[in-house]
Amino acid sequence: MFAHTALRQRCAKWLLATGLFLLLGACVEKPSTLERVKEDGVLRVITRNSPATYFQDRNGETGFEYELVQHFADDLGVKLQIETADNLDELYDALGKPSGPVLAAAGLVSSERRKTQVKYSHPYLEVTPQVIYRNGRARPTGAKGLVGKKIMVLKGSSHADQLAELKKQYPALQYEESDAVEVVDLLRMVDEGQIDLTLVDSNELAMNQVYFPNVRVAFDLGDTRDQRWAVAAGEDNSLLNEINEFLDKAQKNGTLQRLKDRYYGHVDVLGYVGAYTFAQHLQQRLPKYEKHFKSYAKVEQVDWRLLAAIGYQESMWQPEVTSKTGVRGLMMLTQRTAQAMGVSNRLDPRQSIQGGAKYFMKIKEELDDSIQEPDRTWFALAAYNVGSGHLEDARTLAKREKLNPNKWLDVKKMLPRLAQKQWYRQTKYGYARGGEPVHFVANIRRYYDILTWVTQPQLEGQVAEGNLHVPGVNKDKPADKSSPM
């Protein structure tokens, strides 16, 4: 009997101890989302691969959302890890996965149907949804004018939600939601007449309209709306609270305004300005820097007129120019490139030309040996503009299309595809403004042709005297087609 009682007492003590252990274990709190991020040392973010959010150019990762979320990661003292989603449904779904990203920064607008999936942050950018049509076609002036039109929008977007609401009022309204396109694709399709209308936010139109001369705003569809970041609905509020504090601070300290100005507040004044203006600048600007072009061209063994043409395309031979993306100087060098090339002052025209010459030849020497002149020069120019990685992506696409990846004539057909989702999703480096390097190379070739022609000994005096005839303006004076090598 005593043994039985002692056994029961030991069992009771064991059960009590076990219960206390389990109870204490239950009282130990799991780390919050914010604590997990800091412990891991990585902020995992999912976004869209597009000009207004995130993409890679010759200078590395860039985009409005990328820069803003990089500031947030820096504030947390952690590394930023970017993932991209092919479409909005994939983006929202990824947030709900245990091993997925903890934050979506993708130009999102609060959506009622998404509120079971995510919690939205404080706003950081105000945008207006706009109906886009092709210039020369009938312009719809209101919602009723959308009926009978071929309309396409991003699948799962707030624009699709708007059209769904309008369809209740106008049952005949038809539209297509696509997860195979991005905003750039939609604008291109309107520009080329493949679809009648699309809906985009005002910030994305502002960034891309220069590349699509036929697109116009028909009307604003509703009031302005706010873009926000998002976290999974099932997560605690620790990270969301930190995000809101950061965004509020960025609004007050000018960080947001600086990013808005960089990406949306400027008109790109560089580029082709006409042969007459170029002729004026030959006489007024080039003489100040010609000796530097010649000096460093000799060092790097490149035609000085090609270097001068690059300089004109980049800055119109203005040594103090600064672009919206932070590249500076006559040759428009990034800070990183300048440091790598030994340039301490990008606004010093001599140093800028030296760095630009060195950088161009470095790119050219790194190209595949199978690329021969004159294509090698055009490839190097394209890489100078868009980055070597994207150039290789275009060459890969050329191979798949059974074109010659070593010929500029073929590769330049592929570069614009890097701005189209159906193509860039197949590439290593993703989205790029692929049309830009095509125009970049074409402009430089024209400037080079003119420089080659006017620097013939018998014509150099005409430049100094202002009696210059420019090829393309005066048809009786064809440009010399000498190679730039």
UniProtKB/Swiss-Prot annotation:
Membrane-related topology note: Peripheral membrane protein
Gene3D superfamilies to which the protein is assigned, alphabetical: 1.10.530.10, Periplasmic binding protein-like II
Signal peptide (from-to): 1-29
LT domain: annotated segments: 268-485
Reaction(s) the record says it catalyses: Exolytic cleavage of the (1->4)-beta-glycosidic linkage between N-acetylmuramic acid (MurNAc) and N-acetylglucosamine (GlcNAc) residues in peptidoglycan, from either the reducing or the non-reducing ends of the peptidoglycan chains, with concomitant formation of a 1,6-anhydrobond in the MurNAc residue
Claim: Cell wall biogenesis/degradation is one of the keywords in the record: yes
GO biological process terms on file: cell wall macromolecule catabolic process; cell wall organization; peptidoglycan catabolic process
Entry function: Murein-degrading enzyme that degrades murein glycan strands and insoluble, high-molecular weight murein sacculi, with the concomitant formation of a 1,6-anhydromuramoyl product. Lytic transglycosylases (LTs) play an integral role in the metabolism of the peptidoglycan (PG) sacculus. Their lytic action creates space within the PG sacculus to allow for its expansion as well as for the insertion of various structures such as secretion systems and flagella.
E.C. no: 4.2.2.n1
Protein name: Membrane-bound lytic murein transglycosylase F
Gene (UniProt): mltF
Pfam families per UniProt: SBP_bac_3 (PF00497), SLT (PF01464)
GO MF annotation list: peptidoglycan lytic transglycosylase activity
Keyword flag Transport: no
Catalytic residues, chain numbering: 314
Domain remark from Swiss-Prot or TrEMBL: The N-terminal domain does not have lytic activity and probably modulates enzymatic activity. The C-terminal domain is the catalytic active domain.
Residues covered by region (Non-LT domain): 30-267
PANTHER family xrefs: MEMBRANE-BOUND LYTIC MUREIN TRANSGLYCOSYLASE F
Source taxon at top rank: Bacteria
Subcellular location: Cell outer membrane
GO CC, alphabetical: cell outer membrane
Organism the protein comes from: Pseudomonas putida (strain ATCC 700007 / DSM 6899 / JCM 31910 / BCRC 17059 / LMG 24140 / F1)
Homology family: In the N-terminal section; belongs to the bacterial solute-binding protein 3 family. In the C-terminal section; belongs to the transglycosylase Slt family.
Top-tier EC class: lyase
Residue ranges, annotated region (Disordered): 465-485
